[in-house]
């Protein structure tokens, strides 16, 4: 069985052989951790001590979320500067929040109060408490996950029913807030499975232009999000997480992220061709047939995708990788064309 990879001036052939050797790699998960302050009541006069932050984790994966790694890095940066910052984390995957019924009782029969009693009350209380809301979520089908959209829908009791456009909204109509939200700040942090975030978040930004007001929130959108769970790529993903951490430091100082930091955050983790080869190989199925392929071949493909074509010195080589525990081997051939 022979598969070909073409890298500019070289062809990389992958060929199975009947030999055995090196051990297959073991996954090593190095989880980022962040010290979350214990929620406690604070009076208005204590607000100057530290920022109050509500982290809304909209990933169905909960604490296993790839995006959450970025959000925690951002919080680490904030805590380096603002050691008195108080942080509450709300994992929507662990909450019982029913879909909005569209009954509008919260506007006329029980103003400001939903007729359903569930965990959404905790969310509304958290939003009223916080100075900064961090919306942490993966991109699902070019929008937010259903859990998060449900949470957004259930914010209806926070609005008044009257037609009144708010600052920064789109000009197509709106409803005024029931509460003074003028001092609230918002940050969107999201990862997606495409090689770039560019042009993939149009519907997300349109949604939050209505929710928060255009220009009234910051955002960190990162492509290649699945790489944050791959231990073998930790050196590169840690570099990116440090950029996110720096953005957190800046935000703690200026309540904004500098253009230099934003430019670094827009950088790709890997070039498009490298990432897409890794991504395609990760599914473990044949590209043409869609049938499941040998997992050893899948692993070999992923390694081959990281080959640096600029290092090719015009000398043809064969690299044989032996998986002794499985009794299999594959050859990678560099061929000048």
Where are these regions (language model features)?
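Low-complexity, intrinsically disordered or signal/transmembrane-proximal segments
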Residues: 4, 20-26, 42
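Short, positively charged and aromatic/hydrophobic N-terminal segments
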Residues: 11, 40-42, 46-47, 265-268
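Intrinsic-disorder-associated, low-complexity terminal segments enriched in Asp/Asn/His/Tyr and depleted
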Residues: 13, 27-33
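N-terminal beta1-alpha1-beta2 submodule of the flavodoxin-like/Rossmannoid cofactor-binding fold
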Residues: 48-163, 213, 238-290
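Short, glycine-/small-residue-rich phosphate/pyrophosphate-handling segment
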Residues: 161-214
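Beta-strand-loop-alpha "switch" segments that mediate conformational coupling across diverse proteins
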Residues: 217-224
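Acidic, aliphatic-rich amphipathic alpha-helical segments
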Residues: 291-331
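Conserved small/polar residues in nucleotide/adenosyl-binding loops
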Residues: 335-337
């Amino acid at each position: 069985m022979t598969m070909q990879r073409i890298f500019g001036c070289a062809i990389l052939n992958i060929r199975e052989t009947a030999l055995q050797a090196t051990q297959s790699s073991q996954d090593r998960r190095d989880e980022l951790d962040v010290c979350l302050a214990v929620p406690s009541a604070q009076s208005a006069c204590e607000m100057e001590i530290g920022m109050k932050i509500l982290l809304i984790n909209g990933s169905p994966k909960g604490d296993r979320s790839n995006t959450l790694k970025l959000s925690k890095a951002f919080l680490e940066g904030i805590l380096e500067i603002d050691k008195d910052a108080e942080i509450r984390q709300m994992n929507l995957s662990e909450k019982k929040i029913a879909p909005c019924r569209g009954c509008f009782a919260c506007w006329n029969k029980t103003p400001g109060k939903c007729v359903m009693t569930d965990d959404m009350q905790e969310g509304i209380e958290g939003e009223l408490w916080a100075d900064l809301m961090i919306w942490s979520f993966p991109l699902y089908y070019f929008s937010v996950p259903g859990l998060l959209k449900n949470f957004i829908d259930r914010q209806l009791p926070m609005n008044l029913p009257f037609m009144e456009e708010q600052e920064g909204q789109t000009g197509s109509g709106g409803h005024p807030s029931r509460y003074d939200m003028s001092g609230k700040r918002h940050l969107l942090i999201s990862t997606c499975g495409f090689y770039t975030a560019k042009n993939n978040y149009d519907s997300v930004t349109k949604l939050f232009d209505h929710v928060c007001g255009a220009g009234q929130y910051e955002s960190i959108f990162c492509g290649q999000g699945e790489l944050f769970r791959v231990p073998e790529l930790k050196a590169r993903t840690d570099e990116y997480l440090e950029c996110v951490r720096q953005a957190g430091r800046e935000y703690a100082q200026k309540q904004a992220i500098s253009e230099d930091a934003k430019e670094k955050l827009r950088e790709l983790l890997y070039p498009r061709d490298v990432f897409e080869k890794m991504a395609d190989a990760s599914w473990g199925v044949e590209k043409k047939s869609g049938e499941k392929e040998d997992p050893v071949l899948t692993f070999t493909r992923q390694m081959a995708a990281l080959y640096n074509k600029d290092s090719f010195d015009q000398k043809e080589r064969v690299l044989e990788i032996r998986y002794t525990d499985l009794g299999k081997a594959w050859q990678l051939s560099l061929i000048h064309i």
